[in-house]
Design a protein with these regions (language model features):
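Short, acidic/polar
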Residues: 1-8, 62, 146-153, 294-304
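Acidic-and-aromatic substrate-binding clefts and catalytic sites of carbohydrate-active enzymes
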Residues: 20-27, 51-57, 167-173, 200-201, ...
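Active-site mouth loops of central-metabolism enzymes
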Residues: 49-56, 136-146, 198-201, 284-296
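An alpha-helical appendage that flanks or caps ligand/catalytic pockets
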Residues: 91-131, 174-304
Length: 333
C-alpha cells in the first residue's frame, strides 16, 4: 500500500485514498499510518468513514493520530455508510446522524468539547492530552460523501468539501455545488473530489472491449450490487440494466429479497472483476460511470467536470496500479 502512495507522490498526484469498509477492506488507519511515514507531501484520505461504523471518540482519535504523523495532510471523508453498512446487512445511517457525526469530529479535532450521548447518558467530552495528536494549527480536511443534494447541503452547513462516486455528469456537479453554497452560512472551505475508474484508449481501441471491462468493471459492478441489494432502485432502471441485475443475482446465487443476500453480493466488492462477469459490464454503464476514451476525449470530459466544480479526480486501479496511476498523472498534469 505505502509503495503506491510513494509512487503517487513522486508522480505529482495530490492525494491518496483508502476505503473504510471493514468487511471488505483492511483497516484504513493502519494503512495510512504506513503511508504517512513513507511520504512527505501527498494528502492522505479515508473515503469514507461513517456513524455507527466507528464511535465518535474512536474516529476522532484515529484521525488525530494520523494527523500527528502527517500534519495538515489528512482528509477525513464522512458518509452514511452506503457500502460499509450494507456489507453488514444494515441500511445506511440517516442524514441527521451524519451531520451530527461530522460536526463532532470537526469540533474534537479542533480541540473543542462536544456533547457525547450513549442512550440516556450525556457527557461533555474533549481530548484530554496536549500532545502532537491535537494540532489545530495543522487542521484535518473534512469532506462529506454526496450522491445527492441532501448530503451536498450537509457539506455546505458544515463548510466541508465534497466527495462523490462515479457521478460524471457536469450538471449533477453544478447542482451539488449550488446545494452546498446555498446551505452554507459562511465561506465554504474544501475541495470537491470525484472517485471513478479510468481507462485511456489507444486510437481505434474498443471502448467496450475486455481490457476496458477489466479496468473499470469494478465501478460498474458496484452499481449493479447496489441495484441488486435495493430492488426499488432496480425498478427505475432501463430494461437492459434490469436484466443485468437479474443475471448478476443469479450468478451470485441469491435474490433481491433474501435476508443474507449481502454476503453474496458484496464478495470481492470493488475488486477486479472475474472474467465470467464481463458480460455484466454493459456499454451504457461504462459510458455513464467510468472515464473511458482517448487522451483527447478524456481531457475534454475532465475539463467539463472541472468547470462544474470538481477539483480532483480520484481513481481506484485494479489491473496494473502503477501504470494506471501514471496514466492519471499524465492526464491531470
Amino acid at each position: 500500500m505505502e509503495d503506491l502512495a510513494v509512487q503517487a507522490e513522486e508522480l505529482g498526484l495530490s492525494s491518496f485514498w483508502v476505503y473504510d469498509t471493514p468487511m471488505v477492506h483492511g483497516d484504513p488507519f493502519a494503512a495510512l499510518a504506513l503511508c504517512a511515514k513513507a511520504t512527505s507531501r501527498i494528502k492522505l484520505g479515508v473515503g469514507v468513514t461513517s456513524p455507527t461504523l466507528r464511535s465518535i471518540p474512536a474516529a476522532a482519535s484515529g484521525f488525530a493520530s494520523l494527523n500527528a504523523l502527517a500534519p495538515g495532510r489528512i482528509i477525513c471523508g464522512v458518509g452514511t455508510g452506503n457500502s460499509a453498512r450494507r456489507t453488514l446487512g444494515m441500511p445506511p445511517t440517516k442524514s441527521a446522524e451524519l451531520e451530527t457525526f461530522t460536526a463532532s469530529l470537526q469540533d474534537l479535532s479542533a480541540g473543542r468539547p462536544i456533547s457525547y450521548r450513549e442512550g440516556v447518558r450525556v457527557s461533555d467530552i474533549q481530548f484530554l492530552h496536549a500532545g502532537p495528536q491535537q494540532l489545530p494549527t495543522d487542521p484535518i480536511e473534512f469532506v462529506v460523501a454526496a450522491q445527492g443534494l441532501k448530503s451536498a447541503a450537509i457539506a455546505g452547513r458544515r463548510r466541508t468539501g465534497l466527495l462523490s462516486f462515479a457521478i460524471l455528469d457536469p450538471d449533477a456537479w453544478r447542482a451539488f455545488q449550488r446545494a452546498r453554497l446555498e446551505a452554507a452560512d459562511g465561506p465554504v472551505v474544501g475541495d470537491s473530489y470525484l472517485t471513478t475508474s479510468l481507462c485511456v484508449l489507444g486510437e481505434g481501441e474498443d471502448p467496450h472491449g475486455d481490457a476496458v471491462r477489466d479496468a473499470i468493471g469494478h465501478t460498474v459492478l458496484s452499481f449493479l450490487v447496489f441495484a441488486a441489494d435495493k430492488p426499488s432502485f432496480a425498478e427505475v432502471l432501463g430494461p437492459e440494466e434490469r436484466e443485468a441485475v437479474q443475471r448478476f443475482l443469479t450468478q451470485r446465487g441469491t435474490t433481491g429479497t433474501a435476508p443474507d443476500r449481502f454476503r453474496r453480493l458484496y464478495t470481492n466488492y470493488l475488486g477486479r472483476i472475474d472474467p465470467t462477469e464481463r458480460d455484466l459490464i454493459l456499454p451504457s454503464l461504462i459510458d455513464k460511470l467510468a472515464l473511458v476514451g482517448t487522451r483527447d476525449n478524456l481531457l475534454r470530459r475532465i475539463a467539463a467536470l472541472e468547470a462544474a466544480g470538481v477539483d480532483e479526480l480520484v481513481i481506484q486501479p485494479v489491473v496494473d496500479p502503477p501504470t494506471e496511476l501514471a496514466e492519471l498523472a499524465k492526464l491531470t498534469a
